[in-house]
Amino acid sequence: MNKINESQLEMDEISKKELHESIIESLLFVSGEPLKLKQISAILECTTKRAQEVLNNMMLKYNDNCRGVKLININDSYQLVTKNENSDYVRKLLKTNTRQALSQAALETLAIIAYKQPITRIDVDEIRGVKSDRAILTLQEKKLIQECGRLDVPGRPILYETTDEFLKNFNLGNIDELPPMEQIASELDEVAVDEEVKEGTE
């Protein structure tokens, strides 16, 4: 193969990668939800290895450039999300966020499940010292936690774990990226103070 043909092949390969990046960007934008790697490769009609290479390259581009969004990978699912440093401005537009939308009880329950998962409601109740039925129902409705089986003991109580939606809302790639428990406790205290201030002005 001569140099001209080699150069043409290289150009074709670059063009194909750029086309795949463009298609993936459109898919993620239209979806608004995380897309599985296998789903993306099926739409592109290419191997998962090829799709992975394109996605990795896209993640580098988004992280290096001064863009308002970034490409994240959560358990082999990809999604375009706003960058953390712009969250205050986005919050002004949305007027609310996940943490503000949750009560103190729900936040406490969510923190316990996040760090102790899988865990039963009874165990959550024992840690909190109060009933958590309503908080757990709220977290399920917001798709932040889900049932993940039953504990093999008499009564077979339901086990709960956090979801990919939880990871997305708290800007985590996986559960191992959870901050220290002390930091979460501090944030919960701030939320409690905010709620007391609101109640005092109503």
UniProtKB/Swiss-Prot annotation:
The UniProt family comment states: Belongs to the ScpB family.
Provenance organism: Clostridium acetobutylicum (strain ATCC 824 / DSM 792 / JCM 1419 / IAM 19013 / LMG 5710 / NBRC 13948 / NRRL B-527 / VKM B-1787 / 2291 / W)
Give its localization: Cytoplasm
- Pfam families, alphabetized: SMC_ScpB
Key words of the record:
Cell cycle, Cell division, Chromosome partition, Cytoplasm
Q: Which residues cross the membrane?
A: none
Write out the function statement from the record.
Answer: Participates in chromosomal partition during cell division. May act via the formation of a condensin-like complex containing Smc and ScpA that pull DNA away from mid-cell into both cell halves.
Gene name for this UniProt entry:
scpB
Assembly and oligomerization? Homodimer. Homodimerization may be required to stabilize the binding of ScpA to the Smc head domains. Component of a cohesin-like complex composed of ScpA, ScpB and the Smc homodimer, in which ScpA and ScpB bind to the head domain of Smc. The presence of the three proteins is required for the association of the complex with DNA.
The protein in question is named Segregation and condensation protein B
